[in-house]
Every structure is written in C-alpha cells, then in structure tokens.
Amino acid sequence: MTEHIERPGDTPMPQPEKTLLALCPGAEFMVKYLSHAYGEQWRVITRPEEGVDVDAAVMISSTDIYDVIEGNACDEDTPVKADSPLARDEAMFADYCRRHELPCLILRAANIVGTGMTGLPMRIARGIACGMLMHISGNSATISVVHAIDVARLSVELQDAPGIYNITDGTDTTIDALINAIAHRMKDKNVGTLRPRWARWLYGRRYYGTLTRSLTFDDSRVRRVLEAEGRSTDMINVVQRLNTHQYVQDDI
C-alpha cells in the first residue's frame, strides 16, 4: 500500500461543496464552461442523481425552440415549435425546479460559439475545413450568436433572477462575417464564393435557406434585468474575438 506523505507547502485540493444541475441538450460542451464559471466549490451534474442534493439549476436551451425560420429581433414571446424536444425538456426542467423548490433559470442561447461547439457554427467550421463551405454571392443574411463564456457567466449572475431569457452577443452578425471569422481561427483557411444557383444545388434547399435567411433574436429582457441589478451588459463580440483573440493552451 502506498502512503501519501504531505510535503510542507502542499495545498489540499478543494472539494466541491455544492451541486449545480445543468441541463444542456445538444450543447453538452457547455459543462466545462459552467464548471469554470461556478468554480471549484461546485460540482456540475447533467441529470439528477439519487441521494444528491441540488443547490442550483440551469437549463441551457436554444433559440432553435422558436417556430420561426426567418425574422428579426424575435423575443421570448415568439411561439415555440409544438413538437420541439427542447419545449418538452424545458417543461420537465421547470417541473423539477418547482418540485425541488429551486429557482428555474432557462437560457435560450443563440448559436453558441466555443470549444466543442455544435449546431450551425460547427457545421460551418466543418464545411470550411473540408473546403465545401463557401460564401454565397450577394448574401446579406444576419444571425444571432453568443460566446459560451457569456452563457456560462450569465448562468451564475441570473440565479437570483430566474426566468426565461434569450441570450445573444447583441451584434446580429452577417453569415459572411461569421464564416470569415471561423476561417481565420482555422489558420486563415481560404473560402471561395459561389453563385446562388450553384450554392442551392450544392447545399440543398434547407441548408441553403439557413445560410441565406436572416434570423435574429432580441435579448433586451436579460439586459434590463442585468441593468436593474447593476451588472454589466457587455458581451463578448464573437466575430471580433475569433478575429483578434490570441488563444493560449489554457483557453476554453
């Protein structure tokens, strides 16, 4: 048997004292961001565990829940898809919080950009990597995005203000600008340009529509709450960060 001998100056590793339940359907990569935001005193679990008391809860939902494929400044009152798995998960999460007397915080994040990202940003990145994703001539479509760091930060800051919030970086970036920024992050990968007719043939009607329709979301509700609590409403500009941030090994 090996005995551990503490040396002078050894600092024992802090043990988590609290538990966060984080439901992140389709965005499980957010767990590492949440762990970083909450700190070492918190343990993050992604589903209830028997015998484990939960001290706080958050659901990282998505603006994909809304029954809309095109529009500008869609707010939290926008109708949701009747058959959306996210709507079902939100209802189950709200019921869990009610039964366990926990504040119910649901963040409907726009397209999340960060390490391990999923959804449209990852599809764009993979398309760039294999040379299949190109600009579409004349495309001026805009979308909402948000950085994973801000989503995690707000999950901490809004624990005392439970509710449902849209989360964006507030910039409503163009698809072209996001493509260029992701390409820059990937060692300045070259991205060509296609005429709409060829792009429609290459990508298919659905993905072509995603790339060419504007769909942005209003986040004024969360900004009002932050202002009322004296907190900063500044968000990371996703495109700017991708273009200028000097990434190091410890970045998440």
Residue ranges and their predicted role:
Residues P14, K18-G39:
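N-terminal Rossmann NAD(P)H-binding glycine-rich loop of SDR-like oxidoreductase domains
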Residues V68-I106, N111-I112:
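Catalytic helix-loop patch of NAD(P)-dependent Rossmann-fold dehydrogenases
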Residues H100-I106, A110-I143:
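NAD(P)-dependent short-chain dehydrogenase/reductase
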Residues A148, T174-N180, R200-G230, Y247-Q249:
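Conserved C-terminal active-site "lid" loop/helix of NAD(P)H-dependent oxidoreductases
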Residues L154-Y207, D251-I252:
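Mid/C-terminal beta-alpha module of Rossmann-like enzyme folds, strongest
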